[in-house]
Amino acid sequence: MPVKKGEMVRAIREKLENSVEAKASDTRFPAYLFETKGEVVDIKGDYALVMFGQVPTPNIWLRLDQIESF
């Protein structure tokens, strides 16, 4: 089922840690990506802009296959 704008999601650890994006930067991802709800605020192509509101952090672009409904 595709993710929609406004939906609550979280990152899938296995898919994010083994991604090309992870290999290009620091692979120590913060726990809130996997443990707290994030809201999809925009979708462009294969990527979703996710806002995690429980912690003061910037929004993050994640591939649609790297997130799941929470």
From Swiss-Prot:
Chemical reaction(s) catalysed: a plastoquinone + NADH + (n+1) H(+)(in) = a plastoquinol + NAD(+) + n H(+)(out); a plastoquinone + NADPH + (n+1) H(+)(in) = a plastoquinol + NADP(+) + n H(+)(out)
GO CC list: plasma membrane-derived thylakoid membrane
Molecular functions per Gene Ontology: oxidoreductase activity, acting on NAD(P)H, quinone or similar compound as acceptor; quinone binding
EC number(s) given by UniProt: 7.1.1.-
Superkingdom field: Bacteria
Keywords from the UniProt entry: Membrane, NAD, NADP, Plastoquinone, Quinone, Thylakoid, Translocase, Transport
Subcellular localization(s) per the UniProt record: Cellular thylakoid membrane
Principal EC category: translocase
This protein's record includes keyword Membrane: yes
Claim: Transport is one of the keywords in the record: yes
Family to which this protein belongs: Belongs to the complex I NdhO subunit family.
Function: NDH-1 shuttles electrons from an unknown electron donor, via FMN and iron-sulfur (Fe-S) centers, to quinones in the respiratory and/or the photosynthetic chain. The immediate electron acceptor for the enzyme in this species is believed to be plastoquinone. Couples the redox reaction to proton translocation, and thus conserves the redox energy in a proton gradient. Cyanobacterial NDH-1 also plays a role in inorganic carbon-concentration.
Subunit relationships: NDH-1 can be composed of about 15 different subunits; different subcomplexes with different compositions have been identified which probably have different functions.
Protein name (Swiss-Prot/TrEMBL): NAD(P)H-quinone oxidoreductase subunit O
Organism from which the protein derives: Nostoc sp. (strain PCC 7120 / SAG 25.82 / UTEX 2576)
